[in-house]
């Protein structure tokens, strides 16, 4: 009895995780009930005979969870059955011309050659990804048609009935899959990618609190709960196979919603690959946080501000990308956070060069530099992800994000200036939208700017000595000298720190 209760609980859990699974089960039952009428209804049975069972078999093996998977399998099975049936009839005809003695030998040779070649072709990566099931059905159908034709006089009628029932079963699956609560693989892939961005952004935004705040004895349970929430990123580490399968299924699907035919699904895989690289760094970062060797808090505090900003701004950038993907809009807001994370990286570089950690023990230095190196990697990957997402948005024709019309400019975001920079790196503050209906010549202290568009973005660039205003048409374009973050600063400091200690 306890076993039954456990099965019921498991069924409820699976159904609650994704209610579409329950609907899919009913859809399969409906398809099987429909094609079973070929066998139960006497006029249909008189026409197809026992071959009606091929329709039932087709539903069982073709009906998949998503529309793309069902379409892919259905088309593979139909085309493979048609081609294999034609070749089987041709092989039977050629073999019959050689006489009853040689006929079985030729049929065996034909079956051997085609089965061997087809099986070898299944190892091709492209065939394995999209046509493996079709090649398998081709081998099965050719063997059945050619071999059974040796004992069957009406070989053409046999092939016709099998092909007809297979097509009927496949069409039933496709129609029910598309028109009864459809599940689109393309939509699932799109949602999965947006969810992965959101998951990683959660870790990066919470990293500062986890790394720099000391754990009080009374807060151990709360800290453990927070750590479990942070480890949600692990689902991204193993998402490659799922993403590739969904992208493969999505290629079979017709246009639906905002996903047109020949949607750039390959670009989704490129973005997902970069995201997994970030997840691997985050996994290493999390392991370093939870390692037995912990760095004293007073040492961490020396570089707390830039590290917090690097992780927080990278997390905010990924959060903005997640929102942009969910809404399928083109937004440049996450570029601002990328610039801010690069600015924080430059601040960290300046601090490290100043020798602020010269008194740190070598072993502590190694642990600290591991964290720094991983965060620098994540910042650089965030910039690559931003560029890849822009390519995806352009290829997929995402909508332009609507900008609120304002008569007066107002500050909507600011990147903190860094006074410690050796170079004149610009830090950007976006002031807002400026509406101009006519051509206006604006004279600034550093030159003249001609404004000839209805919508502009005012960008204020803070330098150490002066302030410049800049207007640009259309989307926000941030022009600034991005910092190139690499491992040289961390490795150089580690070498010098070890030598000094």
UniProtKB/Swiss-Prot annotation:
Highest taxon in the source lineage: Eukaryota
Matches recorded under InterPro entries = ALMT (IPR020966)
Which positions are tagged coiled coil?
none
Q: Where is this region: Disordered?
A: 398-425
Keyword annotations? Ion channel, Ion transport, Membrane, Transmembrane, Transmembrane helix, Transport
Q: Any transmembrane segments, and where?
A: 22-42, 52-72, 78-98, 101-121, 130-150, 166-186
Membrane topology field: Multi-pass membrane protein
This entry carries the following GO cellular component terms, namely:
membrane
Where does the protein end up? Membrane
Which Gene Ontology terms describe the biological processes this protein takes part in? Answer: malate transport; monoatomic ion transmembrane transport
Kindly summarize what the UniProt induction comment says about this protein's expression. Answer: Up-regulated by aluminum.
PANTHER family xref list: ALUMINUM-ACTIVATED MALATE TRANSPORTER 10
The family assignment reads: Belongs to the aromatic acid exporter (TC 2.A.85) family.
Give the protein's biological function: Malate transporter.
Please report the name of this protein according to its UniProt entry.
Aluminum-activated malate transporter 2
Q: Which organism is it from?
A: Arabidopsis thaliana
